[in-house]
Amino acid sequence: MIALLSPAKTLDLTKPNLDIETSKPIFISEAEVIMNNLKELEIQDLCPLMKISEDLGVQTFTKIQDWNTIYYGDEKPFVLSFKGEAYRGLDADDFTKEDLEFCNDSLRILSGLYGALKPLDGTKAYRLEMGTKISIDGSKNLYDFWGNKIMEAVLKDLENHKEKVIINLASNEYYKSIKKIEKKVRVITPVFKERKGIEYKVVTVYAKKARGQMVRYITKNRITKSEDIKNFDLDGYEFNERLSEGDTWVFTRD
């Protein structure tokens, strides 16, 4: 069983006091191709392409120009660097070395630049969303550039797991890059809803955090069987069998 999560736009590169070796992303060669294309762009090209302000464009331009493929094994792990809502829910800062190692086996972080990241892959500062409309070496967009590579990498990792199931906690933008995996293995998609009057509705900011909390729950409880995630109970959520349908598992809270 492997869970999928989207990356965050914000990165914190402050190094933690942690004695654990980081790894080089498996698609570093592909990332280099993408970055070489981005290095040719000026700030005035990046801003409309990435839909960012000029100030953020300057920061992004610097990150792109500084990016390289040199790894020393002591970089900050991506799972500790990402700082979006999902990663606030995951809250990996208090993970033990054993937690991080389990998480490294059971989670893959989808990425526009790196394809698929392991949590303990070393961080290089970047900004590139999967939905960015950029052509790389003749491809139509990043989905076209990545093709089946991300799916094949995750399937290969899944071979080492007893249960061949994907827990999809990624956003639609990122899951689209691996959606064909549904034809190969079972995919369970948890959905998190809040009570609003007499109904339950998805509230984006809470749903993002809950996705990270689900990864935390899987990690801390060493869950390897998908059925066990139905016991997820962090922050008042509980599995709602009535609202769930097929492999779309709904978790609600009042």
Swiss-Prot record:
Pfam families: H2O2_YaaD. It comes from the Bacteria. Coiled coil: none annotated. Signal peptide: none annotated. GO terms for biological process: response to hydroperoxide. GO terms for cellular component: cytosol. Belongs to the UPF0246 family. This is UPF0246 protein CPF_2407. It comes from Clostridium perfringens (strain ATCC 13124 / DSM 756 / JCM 1290 / NCIMB 6125 / NCTC 8237 / Type A).
